Structures are given as C-alpha cells and as structure tokens.
Amino acid sequence: MRILLTNDDGIQAVGIRHLYKGLIDAGHDVLVAAPISEQSAVGHAITIASPLRVKEFVENGFRGLGVSGTPADCVKLALTTLMQDKPDLVVSGINAGANVGVDILYSGTVSAATEGALMGYPAVAVSADDFAPVDLLEQGAYVADFIAGRPWEALAPRTVLNLNFPKRPIAETLPLALCPPTQAVYNDWYVTRQDPRGRDYHWLTGVIPPEALTPDSDRALLTKGHITLTPLRFELADAAAMASLAARLGLRTDV
C-alpha cells in the first residue's frame, strides 16, 4: 500500500521512526510528512496566518518531509500538494502517550488521522501508553500486520481506527480488545512556580480517577495490558439531539 505517515511528536521522534521501519519492512510505499517540532495536544489546529515550510530529512535509512506546522497541516498539505500519487491509507503515530477517552479530543495524533478521514481516506491513529519510549519496533511491526487485513473496508466513511499499546513488550500484552472510549474526564490542576526572574508560571497536570472508569473502556483495558482498538466516527451533528430539539422547540428538520 501507499501510506501517508505523520505524527504529533515531531519527525525526529522514536515513534514515527520505528513505525516507518515497520511499514517499509512490510513492503509498503511510505511518504512521511510530519511536524518539524513537537506538536503534542494541539488538537485539530491548522495554520492560516503564516506560511508553511518543508524540509527534507534523510538519515539512517529514514526519509521524510518535516513541515513547520501542526499535524493536521501536515496531512492537508501532503494530500493536496506534496503527494503526486494519493495514498491508500493515512497513519498517524506512534504517539508517546496513550490517546484514550478525552485525550482523543486534545490529541494532535488522532486529529492528523481525522484530517485524513475528513478528506476521504482510511485512517489509523497509533499510540503507546509510555511518555518516554525508547523502542517501539515491535509495535511498528504489529501495526504493519494489523493494516494488512484492511479492517477499514468494513467501516463507514470518515471513520478513524484508534489503536493503543500498553507499556509492555508485545509478547506480554493481552489480546486486542475492541472497546469504547472512557467517558471519565481528568481532574485537572495547575502547579504554580516561579521562573529565575521571579515571575509566576503555571504547569498543567491531572489524573483520571480510577474509580470513574468502566471496566470495558479503552483506558481500563489498556491499563490492564490489552492492546485497544476504538473506531471513531466524526459526524458533527447529534441526530438524537436534533429530534429532541425539534420536538421541544416546535421546529422542522427537513427545511
């Protein structure tokens, strides 16, 4: 397959390098278009007030294009401008840190895959439950095996497959679990400190309370040791809410 590969940790991150190797070793034709700098948690932001610049990276068997923008920028630019032959699949990852539950909304990794899906391409987002991974070669090979089955062919358009790996070797993981995202949200707070010039700064931290997790959710199963798979569908309107509001307000939805 011809694959567009991107991420949000940046083009020099371990995750994208090891996923690239897994895909290349499996015989795929891979074009990398990824942010030059760290873009974690930028969501689906795009750049509209400054130009995007592209730099080629060729090193240690890796070849890719670094883009001075967000993950969604990378996908949009690649699919409209950089790629002469359009891809069969958009893959984003492997992210350093899981993207489960509400993290899906914050994630540049998932948003890059979503941009691909919105533009009409099958898309897979891949993350590892480890904020400082040093070796994701096994996970990269797993992804190559996973996409060989072309699971997206059974799905509706604009669907993203969200794949997450637990922090353990592949041989020690529990079976792949198909599961919904947790509905639990973070308890957030900011740590306030002072810089060397005496000015306050604020650093976000937070946790999802374990007691708020349902046992069948992505976060709970990932923590238990499963590889998790969640299909995400980005339909912007809530059909049930449309019907409820129509009844409540006496409005028609067919005008």
Swiss-Prot record:
It catalyses: a ribonucleoside 5'-phosphate + H2O = a ribonucleoside + phosphate. This is 5'-nucleotidase SurE. Binds 1 divalent metal cation per subunit. It comes from Solidesulfovibrio magneticus (strain ATCC 700980 / DSM 13731 / RS-1) (Desulfovibrio magneticus). The keyword Metal-binding applies. Nucleotidase that shows phosphatase activity on nucleoside 5'-monophosphates. Belongs to the SurE nucleotidase family. The keyword Nucleotide-binding applies. It comes from the Bacteria. Its EC number is 3.1.3.5. InterPro entries: SurE (IPR030048), SurE-like_Pase/nucleotidase (IPR002828), SurE-like_sf (IPR036523). It holds the Pfam family SurE. It is an enzyme of class 3 (hydrolase). Its main location: cytoplasm.
